[in-house]
Amino acid sequence: MLCMMAVVSIKAAEQPNVKLTVGNNAVQVQIDGRPFTTYHFVGEAASPFVRPYFYPILAADGTPLTSDQMITNPKEHPHHRSMWVGMGSVNGLDHWSFQQKPAPPPQRHVRFESVGADSLVEDLVWEDLAAKPLLTEKRTIGFLAYPDGSRSIDLTIALTAAGQDVTLGDTKEAGLCAIRVSSQISRKPTLMNSRGGKGEKQVWGKPADWVDESGTIDGKPFGVAIFDAPTNLRYPTPWHAREYGLLAPNEFGLHVFDPKLPGGAGDMKIANGRTITFRYRAVFHPGDAAAANIDQKYGAFVKGLDK
């Protein structure tokens, strides 16, 4: 049975002109009359589909800021489909990666509960290999823009155990708000976090409010950041963040990130019928983290959580 828990969208002070066009397979998103992203919620026959994803994600000037590896380099992390929600161990089943055989368990779109001026509320089911529900999800997606040309996607993810207890397992392969940045950005990247960590050794597996990766695309500076909400369990989250371009908050991989902890230390159990909720914001910005005032944007994000 689908969880009907009310979820409040994360709002910001900015009120861009957002237009959502819902089709049979995807939602087209425009900001101020220019394309921002496409949210693919149902697969098409020509492309393998396991879970919904956002692609492309464009800067205000039209520059693509993310990579869909299924299209650009399917031999390397084909499950990195620009921006997606994934979890590598759901009662032991892999809802993160992609393999041809056996077919991976899907996240299945059920319906859009509502479509607003700048947001969507979507019902989904995370299934097992027999197409039985493990989790129901209510996913709230919000879109906004900043005066400096940055654009953002908000995710509120409410997961409910459906018919049995569900354990989200201690694994490296997880990110309820995961992004693969453009390969141009990751050629000479600056990867950093809110605590002053720079480079993969100081960012991967380390707790932080936010992580940002920036670089250049065709000679122009751009970056991508993800914000973790203080309301999330295990805040501030450790991060599965790599200089090759992956950004993902990972509240679950505690033993993976710190082998001194016992195996399974990061397991998170959801009792049958219970719900846990996570909130994130992804910011797609011109310039590096400092130029984009990511710290200030994070502060505004936190203040907006109660609105």
What are these regions (language model features)?
Residues 1-7:
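Bacterial N-terminal signal peptides
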Residues 8-12:
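Sec/Tat signal peptide C-region and signal peptidase I cleavage site
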Residues 13-77, 156, 230, 289, ...:
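Beta-strand-rich N-terminal accessory domains
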Residues 16, 20-23, 122-171:
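Acidic, contiguous internal or C-terminal segments within carbohydrate-active enzymes
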Residues 39-42, 49-56, 146-193:
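Acidic (Asp/Glu-rich), glycine- and aromatic
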Residues 79-149:
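Extended, loop-rich substrate-binding clefts of extracytoplasmic carbohydrate-active enzymes
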Residues 165-167, 171-238:
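Active-site/ligand-binding surface loops and adjacent short beta/alpha elements
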Residues 227-307:
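Beta-strand-rich recognition/accessory modules
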